[in-house]
């Protein structure tokens, strides 16, 4: 049975881990959200989130975005390549409703899966 947990080991925790992804990322983006990715040496993907107060003033709005991102990652973690992912929220993300937001995330995850397969074949 596949475990769909989101434990501590599946998260990017330190500034150095985030910096590693920001140095040479693969990007998939929409006007509201960007997912950056970079290959890691582990056997599983990891996730980091950046949601600035500049784009979402209220804490409950930032928490909603982070919760939806974590849930999306948790459900797809076994399909994703062994990359470190950083989700960057941009202006206008707060205006999206939950179904639209999850659809956008799903599309971006699929794009990263395709990019990873393409880079493996090269």
Swiss-Prot record:
GO terms for molecular function: 3'-tRNA processing endoribonuclease activity; ribonuclease P activity; tRNA binding. Gene3D superfamilies: 3.30.230.10. GO terms for biological process: tRNA 5'-leader removal. It is an enzyme of class 3 (hydrolase). GO terms for cellular component: ribonuclease P complex. Keywords: Endonuclease, Hydrolase, Nuclease, RNA-binding, tRNA processing. It comes from the Bacteria. It catalyses: Endonucleolytic cleavage of RNA, removing 5'-extranucleotides from tRNA precursor. Its EC number is 3.1.26.5. Belongs to the RnpA family. RNaseP catalyzes the removal of the 5'-leader sequence from pre-tRNA to produce the mature 5'-terminus. It can also cleave other RNA substrates such as 4.5S RNA. The protein component plays an auxiliary but essential role in vivo by binding to the 5'-leader sequence and broadening the substrate specificity of the ribozyme. HAMAP family: RNase_P. Consists of a catalytic RNA component (M1 or rnpB) and a protein subunit. This is Ribonuclease P protein component. It comes from Mannheimia succiniciproducens (strain KCTC 0769BP / MBEL55E).
